[in-house]
């Protein structure tokens, strides 16, 4: 795995995590 793929995977993980935080926040979690 090269650095570009690793960086892209990390970016996608952070994006998904931030969306999960927003959803949980709106649900009162």
Curated annotation (Swiss-Prot):
Molecular function in Gene Ontology: electron transporter, transferring electrons within cytochrome b6/f complex of photosystem II activity
A single cellular component GO annotation: cytochrome b6f complex
Membrane disposition: Single-pass membrane protein
Pfam families (UniProt xref): PetN
SUPFAM superfamilies per the UniProt record, alphabetical: PetN subunit of the cytochrome b6f complex
Keywords attached to this entry: Chloroplast, Electron transport, Membrane, Photosynthesis, Plastid, Thylakoid, Transmembrane, Transmembrane helix, Transport
Claim: Membrane is one of the keywords in the record: yes
Transmembrane segments annotated in the record for this chain: 3-23
Presence of the UniProt keyword Transmembrane in the record: yes
One GO BP annotation of this record: photosynthesis
Subcellular location, record wording: Plastid, Chloroplast thylakoid membrane
Coiled coil regions, renumbered to chain: none
Function: Component of the cytochrome b6-f complex, which mediates electron transfer between photosystem II (PSII) and photosystem I (PSI), cyclic electron flow around PSI, and state transitions.
Family: Belongs to the PetN family.
NCBIfam families per the UniProt record, alphabetical: PRK14747.1
Record note on quaternary structure: The 4 large subunits of the cytochrome b6-f complex are cytochrome b6, subunit IV (17 kDa polypeptide, PetD), cytochrome f and the Rieske protein, while the 4 small subunits are PetG, PetL, PetM and PetN. The complex functions as a dimer.
Name of this chain's protein: Cytochrome b6-f complex subunit 8
Organism: Porphyra purpurea (Red seaweed)
Gene: petN
């Amino acid at each position: 795995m090269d650095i570009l793929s690793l960086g892209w995977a990390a970016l996608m993980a952070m994006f998904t995590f931030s969306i999960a935080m927003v959803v949980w926040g709106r649900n009162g979690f």
